[in-house]
Amino acid sequence: FRQFSLNARSARVRVVYYAGHGVQVKGRNYLLPVDTEIRAEDEVQAKSADLNELLERLGALPNGINIVILDACRNNPFSGAEVLGPDGRRLKFRGATPAGLAPVEAPLGSMVAFSTAPGGVALDNPSEKNSLYTKHLLDHMRSPGLPLELVFKQVWLSVSRETGRVQVPWESSSLTG
């Protein structure tokens, strides 16, 4: 994230999109690489990307807006307090890894959009290439002239309706203009 924030320093608009596993440990959110092998809770920080750090770095940039889109709570590997290790053993996690991600506040000039509410787990969409959230995001992004906030409002409505409000997207925004 350090390199990204340095490279994007002069950009007017910065967009980060992540689809994959996301977990919280002790109130901090982490995005897990696709090939990660985490055998114990204390390995999460060293083997993942710290979402809170990304938001802090983006918030420190003096100009431009930041849009962070996270489709990151599908099939949370640590929910249920037990995970299958690489050798087939069941590993227990002790209470610090609840399902879903912890709430975050978007830094000034930023919007953070989640595929589901804090603590929630997003549904898979096994019959399609993209998740349900990303499917609706792509559909509504194609609407010409639709302001960013309304794009995400439409995604919220579509996902909530299709899942019977089992999955409800969530945003935190401090965009000013």
Each model region followed by its residue ranges:
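Cysteine endopeptidase catalytic domains of the caspase/legumain-like
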Residues: F1-G177
